[in-house]
Every structure is written in C-alpha cells, then in structure tokens.
Amino acid sequence: LSPSASSNNPANDWMVKSAEYVLSEMSPKVFWGENAPRLASKMGAPVVKRLRKIADENGYTFSIFKTKSLLHGLSQVRDRTFYFFWKGDTVPLFEYINIPPTMIADDIRAVVNDKNDPMSQILCNEKKPSDDPYYKFILDSIEGGITHKEFAAKITKTTNVQDYIEEHTTYNKVAEWMREHGYDNVARKCDRAYHKLKAGGNIMRKGVEIPKDKIGAFVGHMPTSIAHPDEDRFLTVREAMSLMKLPNDYQMINAKRSLNHMCQNVPVTTAEHPAAMVKKYLEGKLD
C-alpha cells in the first residue's frame, strides 16, 4: 500500500486491477491477497472503498483480516493485513489463533547448518560481532571483559548495542574510550550523538543486535545485524531464512545480494493461518 493511500495513487493499482480482472473474468469462490497493516487503518480507507465497490459490482463480499506474527508462534513483531473477496453476501468466521511465540535465540540455535547446504555456508555479514567498536566497548568497558556468548546469556531481551550503551552511560564517555583505542571515526560519531541527544534530538541505531526473546520486523538492516546467540558471528543465510519460516530446503539465487528478497515477503507461518481458513471455507467447514 502506498503511504499516501490515495484512492487514485498508481502504486495501489495492482490491487484494484487484479481484483477487477479475477472477479469479473474468473469468478472464483474466494480471491484473497496480503498487504501492509496500513490497509486496515484510516490511511487505507480510500483503497478499501474501491475494493468494496468492485466486490459489490461482481457479487462478492469484501473483508479484512489484520494480524500480527506474534500470534502465529513467530518471535517477530510484524503486523500484516489480508484481504478477501467472498462470492455471495456472507463471510466465514475464522478460527481464533494465538500460538505463543518461541524465543528468537532458540529459533536460531535450532537451525541445522548442513555442510552440503549452500545456504548454510554463506554468512549474511562476514564480520565478527565482537569486532564492532560499540559492542567491544560493552564487552570490555561496561561488562569488564566478557565474551559475546557470556553477554548473550546474561541479557533477558533482544538487545541493540547502542540501546544498551545509552542505558549505562553517555556518548561523550564512549567517545573517550573510542579515542583511547584508536577508533577516531567512531569517536566523532559518538561526539555528534552526544550533542544531538543532549539537545533533545534522536539518532539512528542500526548496530549489532543480540537476539534473545523476540525481534522487530526482519527487514532492512536486520539480516546483517543479528548475531548468533552463542557463536561470535552473524547469521547464515539458512538461519536468516528460518526467521521467515521458509522451508529448510529452500534455495535463494544470488543469496548474498538478495537478502532483502526474503524480508519483503510475509512470514510463512503468518500467511499459513488465513490459507488454512480459506481451505476450510472451500470445504464447508467454517460457519
């Protein structure tokens, strides 16, 4: 959904045109799709109005199902919206779902990195997490010289290294440590961060993420920022794909350059429930 959500925004035409064609030319019992959570908000109302009109004109009833991945057993904070065109004037009642999410650290540990699996041999980020200057400051200065594994065991929630630093000290002190250890460029960034925060501004925090309970949406910088919970490395492509619940034998073409492709899809388990509900509807098993 285009952020503007204007009913005539060309970026939203694919939903309208696909619905017009499928409902008028193919006339299925149900036609459904997936979109951003904005579709179920006030911002998406103009698009929803157009889709409802198409439904009415073709003898269908339109409905929306908004959900979050945490309800589908996935330890990822990620809301999604599914939309449906049901032939006739009624819609089925979906079964409620609330599968407790697992711990993200345990999800990563459970992945088997097979030496014969190409996706298990490719790291999303070939650097070492503990070589990151901010994380090194935490391990050596704040924590007194512990290992990545020890820090990961200590924390109780997924931790961004910059958030952790801000909870324990200020960037002007971090800048001093950075200069003492030869990280002059990082020291200058710390100086800017200190003054910006002091003035009431905000900064971007895209540093190393140490996984524990759950993570935010697995998009953007996340695939290259999440560390393994035990080993001082970043995730393999196989481990990254597992966070989207992709099949264990799934292979990506040009995986290193295509990391964002896995992120731009709805997690498999999130889509699994509405798919199961559509199947039950077609089998006459829903009210």
Segment roles from a protein language model:
Residues 1-198:
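Class I S-adenosyl-L-methionine
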